[in-house]
């Protein structure tokens, strides 16, 4: 709950200053980690860094919702998601490379420099987008609307299904006797497919509409994740194809899921829209924790080749909530506010 709390505390600042402040604090946390020589110091540094990481993504998403042109809103969200995806895919191997050449703590100093640079660019290039001061009680308003908290579940379950597989993908590939070189190449294809998927998801939502796009992408995600479990017993090429498919369709859901949060906030909690968007973004992080936990249970009790089926079940739950919960509520709400033709 760090991101919603900090968002309320800094809501009196304009969005440019909010983003610059959180980036600076994120950089300072990594500087502290670099110079830390105790477990307590490292723990404090990582705690601050974790808080700021969530807030940065939330602020970027809110800016997209409030200030991007309506026709380009999905693409703006896709670009934010691409930054997040690229950082995940490139950051780990880059950090390993830097730590091997310059020492274990050097990646933290590199991250601090990049974060300070981003903060400076924010101050000198971003307009002063105004922000409405928020209150802690506004966070509770979001949970009073069933479609809104159903949206939280869709976000957590959909994104969680990706991480059931993602966290233990290397274990699966090693069990299937892939060499380290082949695993590295598969991860490269995984990253490329994820990046293309993010762009595709945003474009599809613009062309076909939010609900049609998200329903299609979740369906394809379920099929791709389920195929991963069956591919364990088939050829290696089939497994590689299923990994690429799950990467593409799993990450393609990001932009439509973010759009879903904004749409539900605007429709059901218009007076506390920013707070609802914040909580919707937090649901994605909860999904990461949920997916990692479910994936670990699957590996321990069933075997890593069952992770795909477990992930598909989470995505199926998200699709059912979207279809039989949120869509009905949204259509009912729209029919009430629609003008009469009689």
Language model: regions and residue ranges:
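C-terminal transmembrane helical hairpin of 12-TM major facilitator-type secondary transporters
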Residues: 212-257
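Extracytoplasmic gate region of multi-pass secondary transporters
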Residues: 148-198
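Paired small-residue
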Residues: 29-32, 40-49, 237-245
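Cytoplasmic helix-loop-helix junction between adjacent transmembrane helices
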Residues: 39, 45-83
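A late C-terminal transmembrane helix in Major Facilitator Superfamily
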Residues: 264-301
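Conserved MFS/SLC helix-loop-helix module at the cytosolic interface between two early adjacent transmembrane helices
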Residues: 1-37
């Amino acid at each position: 709950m760090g991101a919603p709390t900090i968002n309320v505390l800094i809501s009196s600042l304009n969005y440019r200053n909010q983003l610059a402040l959180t980036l600076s604090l994120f950089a300072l946390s990594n500087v502290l980690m670099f110079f830390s020589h105790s477990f307590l110091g490292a723990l404090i540094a990582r705690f601050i860094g974790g808080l700021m990481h969530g807030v940065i993504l939330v602020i970027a998403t809110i800016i997209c919702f409030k200030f991007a042109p309506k026709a380009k809103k999905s693409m703006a969200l896709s670009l934010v998601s691409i930054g997040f995806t690229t950082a995940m895919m490139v950051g780990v191997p880059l950090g390993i490379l830097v730590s091997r050449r310059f020492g274990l703590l050097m990646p933290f100093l590199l991250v601090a420099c990049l974060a300070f640079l981003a903060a400076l660019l924010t101050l000198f290039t971003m307009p002063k987008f105004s922000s409405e001061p928020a209150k802690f009680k506004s966070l509770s308003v979001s949970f009073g609307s069933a479609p809104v908290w159903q949206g939280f579940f869709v976000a957590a379950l959909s994104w969680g299904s990706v991480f059931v597989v993602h966290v233990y993908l290397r274990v699966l590939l090693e069990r299937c006797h892939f060499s380290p070189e082949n695993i590295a190449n598969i991860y490269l294809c995984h990253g490329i497919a994820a990046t293309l998927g993010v762009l595709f998801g945003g474009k599809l939502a613009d062309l076909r509409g939010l609900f049609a796009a998200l329903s299609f992408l979740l369906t394809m995600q379920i099929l791709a994740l389920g195929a991963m479990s069956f591919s364990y017993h088939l050829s290696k090429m089939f497994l590689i194809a299923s990994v690429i498919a799950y990467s593409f369709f799993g990450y393609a859901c990001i932009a439509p899921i973010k759009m879903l949060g904004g749409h539900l906030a605007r429709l059901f909690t218009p007076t506390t829209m920013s707070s609802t968007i914040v909580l919707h973004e937090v649901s994605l992080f909860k999904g990461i924790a949920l997916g990692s936990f479910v994936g670990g249970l699957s590996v321990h009790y069933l075997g890593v080749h069952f992770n795909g089926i477990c992930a598909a079940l989470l995505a199926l739950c998200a699709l059912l909530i979207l279809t039989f919960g949120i869509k009905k509520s949204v259509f009912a709400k729209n029919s009430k506010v629609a003008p009469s033709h009689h």
